[in-house]
Amino acid sequence: MENSEPTRGAPRAIVAMSPSLDPTIGIVVCIPCFRRPEHLRQTLQSLTDQHTDRRFAVVMVENDASACGSVPVASAFLRSGKLPGLCVVEPRQGNCQAINAAFETAQAIFIDATHFLMIDDDEIASAEWLERMVGAAEVTGADVVGGPVLQRFGDEAKRGLQRHPAFRPTYEASGPVPIIYGCGNCLIKRPVFEKLGSPAFDLRFNFLGGGDVDFFSRSRRIGMKFYWIEEAVIFEAVPDSRTRPSWIALRGLRIGAINYHVQRKVALTPWLRARLAVKVLALLPLSLCRAMYLFLTEWKPLIALHPMIVAAGGLLAAIGIEPQPYKASKITS
């Protein structure tokens, strides 16, 4: 796994801020941004339309420092007074750099904030999203709350892909869960960040992705409690490019690589590393059985192949071969 660039270098810069920003706001929604200004406009509008009496702010992080395409959209919303908050440019490129910048800025500016939510810049929050997420955190006492991300496909003929493991939500009912895996619809309480230390997202996952899986895995190991709220829905715009078999296969390889590296981090002894190697090899024949079962139940070859592709991704990562989809050169939109 390739390490990211060092954390030193050009500083972050606040490039837009709403008038009379109140640092005592207790809820902050963080939005990493990269080359999707029109989608960001819809994301921000969905936050403006939230059905809640709770005061909240937004922190947007532009991670394309050369073009800064998201900044005009962010500035317009902030200047209009529709949403309180600010926009920061993070010049160090990468998924984890952007997310760390968002959470670190939110904690530093909003010193009384206790609840930090995240939504991606290609997602739209349902009207009750924030109220349900924060309410679940308050009622259950959970340290981390997650909710479903449902796809909106540009091509309606592709809606069947919602059953594919690469798109399907992890859980289907509200309640306590052992862990969540994605940060595209999550709430994290401040003590989680304080206990895990900085940077929150390990920069070794900066270009591969999976910093969220690693973060939540570490949270579970120190005893943090997780809760899933099925009604706190976020919708994700899925372009046609992400419905191609090649993209879905690459995502499966990436999932396998992420799973391997998260486990490799805690395999600190020769015995544990040997056991992990055996597990990686054993997953290949086991994945074939799983693939046969999925084919017989789903009758979709693309779905059935997923376990085998994930297993292959883990094996390839073990020998140093892995995708890096969050490098700027690999991102088109």
Where are these regions (language model features)?
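Short, acidic, metal-binding catalytic loop of nucleotide-sugar glycosyltransferases
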Residues: 45-56
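Acidic donor-binding loop at a coil-to-helix junction in glycosyltransferase catalytic cores
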Residues: 206-217
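A recurrent flexible, glycine/aromatic-enriched loop bordering the glycosyltransferase active site
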Residues: 171-188, 206-208
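Conserved donor NDP-sugar-binding/catalytic core segment of glycosyltransferases
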Residues: 128-159
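A conserved acidic beta->alpha catalytic loop
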Residues: 62-73, 123
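N-proximal low-complexity "stem/linker" segments adjacent to membrane-targeting elements
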Residues: 2-46
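Non-catalytic, C-terminal membrane-associated alpha-helical segments of glycosyltransferases
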Residues: 250-257, 268-333
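Short, flexible, basic/aromatic active-site loop/helix in glycosyltransferases
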Residues: 147-148, 162-179
